[in-house]
Swiss-Prot record:
Organism: Sus scrofa
Record-listed N6-acetyllysine modification sites: K17, K29
The protein's name: Cytochrome c oxidase copper chaperone
The gene coding this protein: COX17
Post-translational changes noted in the entry: Acetylation by KAT8 promotes assembly of the mitochondrial respiratory chain complex IV (CIV).
Keywords: Acetylation, Chaperone, Copper, Cytoplasm, Disulfide bond, Metal-binding, Mitochondrion, Phosphoprotein
């Protein structure tokens, strides 16, 4: 565990392929998913919103 964080991801913004929603905002997605699993969706609104804001900042319309 923790090894993936040590490997820098290739800069996807410079490629011509659009970023897929599943790959965008991994930090907020991980925190959101962990919270939902542990506490239930109704207790994780702040993390869900943070992930949505990150996605919107990358141009996703959600």
């Amino acid at each position: 565990p923790g090894l993936a964080a040590a490997i820098p991801a290739p800069p996807e913004s410079q490629e011509k392929k659009p970023l897929k929603p599943c790959c965008a905002c991994p930090e907020t997605k991980k925190a959101r998913d962990a919270c939902i699993i542990e506490k239930g969706e109704e207790h994780c609104g702040h993390l869900i919103e943070a992930h949505k804001e990150c996605m919107r900042a990358l141009g996703f319309k959600i």
